Amino acid sequence: MLTLDTLNVMLAVSEEGLIEEMIIALLASPQLAVFFEKFPRLKAAITDDVPRWREALRSRLKDARVPPELTEEVMCYQQSQLLSTPQFIVQLPQILDLLHRLNSPWAEQARQLVDANSAITSALHTLFLQRWRLSLIVQATTLNQQLLEEEREQLLSEVQERMTLSGQLEPILADNNTAAGRLWDMSAGQLKRGDYQLIVKYGEFLNEQPELKRLAEQLGRSREAKSIPRNDAQMETFRTMVREPATVPEQVDGLQQSDDILRLLPPELATLGITELEYEFYRRLVEKQLLTYRLHGESWREKVIERPVVHKDYDEQPRGPFIVCVDTSGSMGGFNEQCAKAFCLALMRIALAENRRCYIMLFSTEIVRYELSGPQGIEQAIRFLSQQFRGGTDLASCFRAIMERLQSREWFDADAVVISDFIAQRLPDDVTSKVKELQRVHQHRFHAVAMSAHGKPGIMRIFDHIWRFDTGMRSRLLRRWRR
């Protein structure tokens, strides 16, 4: 069967002009004009999509099939062009019957033209074919316009859906034109309104926690210099006090007086429930005289190392991708979970604005991965925000997954971020030594976002930077009062 592209070539119909007219009409539609005025940053992103629209329309016209009736009429026209005038006179009755049978727009005019002339001359033969060709061009142009109109309606519907999605998420995720462009690209997925409302919800929560948002921005902007030791540098002795585990970490070896609520003896806690002794409990708490378990597990010793006296130069580290590990244990539920998800959303915003990648790993008993900056970033973000934190804590697996990711070339300059309350078992020695090697040799940076004031110091010492956001009730009330 004849294709529309072939018909356009045969009749010299300019499809490019029709496509350009359709795109201009689409961009000038009232819906897009209002949207561009409201979200000017997304205008450039949508305009960048025009070449893709143009190519899709060309492909649609190229693959479209011509109706059988029009195909048969075109074939008859081509055969008629090869006839001499005497042959044309002989074939004319069959041609007129064919045009009538096919309900051709040219059929009635053709019969009137023949009836108006008593003799078929060479000039009439040429005029007949010229007018027939014009009729075919009109039919081909109409067919092109019908197909383009169908595509325009479909394209306008798609653009309106993406505009609705992008317009909702632009205040949350788009910080500049780069972010707006990437957000528009990610809006091409099949998403429903109820899906992306989850991102809007956490975006509103993030706006209610300006300290958390500011913390994410500080982490995103943090940049250190790489110091490169000289090969011939003189060495000097450097002494420092280090804390290290002694015997069994956190082993109970007696009782002591302190204000450590987490290690409180049950009899002391019982006095809190007695009205007459409640003030006495608070007095002893303030004076650190409550009976608590004494733990044995850490000691200090002097460590002597040698290091170069001078350094050759400093290379500023580029801002690489984010590898974010989120603790999904039960202790991270509730408000901690909301803060962790909102913090990741803030990092996603930074990654989109600075053309970086943002890779999320959820760790508990197993590791689940999401890439929030890829083509399916919005869908991945929705799946991540839909997760519930009810697992256990396996920090060792988290660090092993990070180190495995850092070995690949595309993630070599990534920043590793661990979001947790850091109430967990101590890390194995092999994991600790590997992390220190990455920090020392490859200058990788490990960030900790601590959601609790009770995180274990033995775990947190491994990080280059510790960003604290205490989610305890007292800290939350203080932050609200300061606002």
Swiss-Prot record:
Q: Which SMART domains match?
A: VWA
Which is one Pfam family of this protein?
Answer: VWA_CoxE
Name the source's superkingdom: Bacteria
Chief site of localization: cytoplasm
Intracellular or extracellular location(s): Cytoplasm
Q: List the disulfide bonds.
A: none
What keywords are annotated for this sequence in UniProt? Chaperone, Cytoplasm
Keyword Transmembrane on this protein?
A: no
Entry GO CC: cytosol
Q: What Gene3D superfamilies does the record point to?
A: von Willebrand factor, type A domain
Listed PANTHER family: PROTEIN VIAA
The entry's family comment says:
Belongs to the ViaA family.
Q: How does it assemble?
A: Homodimer. Interacts with RavA.
What's its job? Component of the RavA-ViaA chaperone complex, which may act on the membrane to optimize the function of some of the respiratory chains. ViaA stimulates the ATPase activity of RavA.
The name under which this protein is listed is Regulatory protein ViaA
Q: Which species is listed as the source?
A: Escherichia coli O9:H4 (strain HS)
Q: Which gene encodes it?
A: viaA
